[in-house]
Design a protein with these regions (language model features):
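Short, conserved DNA-binding cores of transcription-related domains
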Residues: 1-93
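Short, positively charged, Gly/Tyr-enriched micro-motifs
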Residues: 51, 55, 62-157
Length: 157
């Protein structure tokens, strides 16, 4: 089931991931929401090495970063992003793929899921394994999120 009649701007606001714009929401065969997003932040076309904004698209890529559920239901993100050519002659990087603070380069998990997982392990779960299972993450990712959360908390003192 595809829902194209909803306002993309409203859906983007509801998703709440800065820099991503909702293009389409559909239900898969199991009734799970599949949210197709594109990059809505022009700064993502900036080369991570030299900072020059690119205007030359090299290709496209699709990633599926995991995110927090929407209420009790999981949400599957499908990010249709662009691969850019860096046009700066002095830059050693030939090309790069869009990334955002909410979904960093090569990340398979949104920063908000990492943050929620780390906080959950610190406050609600008796061990990292329980938190990892609850959030559907691997133990190393859940542990890293917990360490980040703990480090941030301890640094304040």
């Amino acid at each position: 089931m595809v829902q194209d009649d909803m306002s993309g701007q409203d859906a983007t606001l509801l998703l709440g991931l800065a820099g991503l714009a909702v293009e389409q929401v559909e239900l898969d065969g199991e009734g799970t929401r599949v949210v197709h997003v594109v990059t809505g932040d022009e700064a993502a076309a900036g080369c991570p090495s030299c900072g020059v904004l690119s205007t030359s698209v090299k290709g496209h890529a699709v990633t599926r970063p995991r995110d927090v559920p929407y209420g009790p239901d999981p949400v599957h993100l499908v990010w249709h992003k662009r691969r850019w050519r860096c046009m700066e002659a002095a830059c050693p990087r030939g090309s790069f793929t869009e990334s955002l603070p909410t979904v960093p380069a090569r990340a398979r998990v949104t920063t908000r899921l990492r943050t929620e997982c780390g906080a959950g392990i610190a406050t609600r779960f008796s061990c990292v394994k329980a938190g990892a299972e609850h959030y559907g993450l691997s133990w190393p990712i859940a542990h890293a999120a917990f360490v980040e959360r703990t480090w941030f908390t301890l640094r304040r003192f």
